[in-house]
Amino acid sequence: MIKSFGLLILRLSIGTMLIHHGYEKTADIQNFADAFVRPIGLPFPIISSYIAAYSEIYGSWLLIIGLLTRFGALAIIGTITVAIYHAIVTAGFNIYLLELLILYFGGAFCVLCYGGGEFAIDRFLRKFRIKFNRPHLPFE
């Protein structure tokens, strides 16, 4: 029970702290592409920017509500990995830039490994599936 409560706090913390970054990206996608995507040489900067923004938005919402939790964590891990790469390429191993990114990465990785816990919609769906003998859900 304490593990599930800890996972709930972790999911809510990561989701609520990270979701605004995605919304900020969508507010000025061109500026984000120019400042963050083009310097590291990713192809199709505008499309890559939209992918990053919506990965953060939808990944955060999935973590917050506990639906397809591992898929949401994987989306966040992908975006944060690119952000870590950007921070290292542009500023070197500056711990002040990397520490928050590494915390997001570590938290999302824990959710990816352990799932959403007892207080997630995923758990309710799993119990429903077992009760009615349904096939497996993706990302369990």
How should these model regions be labeled?
Residues M1-A27, I46-Y54, Y58, I65-E140:
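Extended, low-polarity transmembrane helix blocks
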Residues T26-F44:
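Membrane-interface interhelical connector segments
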